[in-house]
A protein has these predicted regions:
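Hydrophobic, membrane-inserting alpha-helical segments
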Residues: 271-311
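Cationic, glycine-rich low-complexity segments
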Residues: 1-266, 302-309
């Protein structure tokens, strides 16, 4: 085997631990901006508050007790799957038309399920509801554990690609000349890849805003999509767009998929890697994420490796 071939087990190990890298990048480079995990407070289907998971500031909102005399409170992570945040104190205070408090407040705790049904409220009475977030390391561990099936599935696909395709190609490449030059080009590629990733994360929030008002921003999206791809995007229904927005707001999931693409590239033999050197840019990665996020594959079956090879 060519000694310059990648240590495939190290690549797979790095990918398995990609969420540790996510934490490091979030803290070191973006100070909690593009890579901040967020928590969601919901009251029924009408009210939704989103704040950084690191925030301990109480979140307040006003909602009406239903005609059935109940209110459903939910505390969860902003994710493509439901991951509850339990043990969250809440306070409900009935308020008058002028916003002044009426009577004694109700103090309750959202349990481990992340859902609390309040049945003691007065029908059609407005309440000020205050959530007191206390997100712990155990909560974050539970969030990360929810992604393990995604990571395992993608690692399996990477191993298949390595065994069936890349490993034989590396063996064929072992007798090629200019290995030292190849290694130097590989360093240049890595630098370009890092710059592309920085560009990608810098534009995540912009992508979210563009999709949130798709028709008004259609011309701006042409910076990332072809006209044909944009036409297909404009045909999507509101549910598909909403799912795409949720995917783009699920930063750990996005990071997992980008990490899978990076791992796939790390396994490539030099000839294939150099071919990509001039093609991998922040815009290319953004294009991939846009196509993936809005194609209805923002779940455990989504496969950025297939998307990239097809792209």
């Amino acid at each position: 085997m060519d000694p310059n071939a990648p240590d495939s087990e190290r690549v797979f190990g790095d990918f398995r631990n990609c969420l540790n890298t996510f934490d490091a990048w979030a803290e070191s480079f973006w100070s909690g901006s593009a890579l901040e995990v967020e928590q969601v407070f919901k009251v029924g289907d009408e009210v939704e508050l989103v704040t950084p998971v690191s925030s301990k500031t109480p979140s307040k909102t006003v909602a009406m007790c239903s005609a059935q005399g109940s209110l459903t409170l939910v505390h969860m992570f902003e994710s493509t799957r439901f991951v509850p945040i339990g043990n969250t104190p809440v306070m409900l205070q009935a308020i008058a038309a002028d916003g002044s408090p009426m009577g004694a407040p109700l103090h309750r705790v959202i349990g481990l399920s992340g859902i609390l049904e309040i049945t003691e409220c007065d029908r059609n009475q407005p309440y000020q509801i205050t959530f007191y977030p206390t997100v712990s390391q155990d909560h974050v561990k539970a969030l990360y554990a929810s992604y393990q099936s995604v990571i395992a599935g993608l690692e399996g696909r990477l191993r298949e690609e390595w065994t069936a395709t890349f490993q034989p190609q590396w063996k064929d490449f072992a007798s090629a000349s200019s290995l030292q030059r190849s290694a130097m080009q590989g360093v240049a590629f890595s630098t370009g890849m890092a710059k592309a990733l920085y560009s990608l994360w810098d534009n995540i929030s912009q992508l979210y805003d563009l999709l949130a008002d798709l028709k008004a921003n259609s011309q701006k999206l042409l910076a990332y999509l072809s006209q044909a791809e944009l036409d297909e995007l404009l045909k999507l229904g509101s549910d598909a767009i909403a799912k795409g927005l949720l995917v783009l707001s699920d930063e750990p999931l996005l990071f997992i998929y980008v990490s899978a693409i990076v791992s796939w590239i790390r396994l490539l033999p030099p000839p294939e890697m150099y071919e990509l050197l001039g093609e991998i840019t922040g815009e290319v990665l953004i294009n991939l994420l846009l196509m993936w996020a809005t194609a209805g594959t923002g779940d455990t079956d989504g496969n950025p490796i297939t998307a990239y090879t097809e792209y």
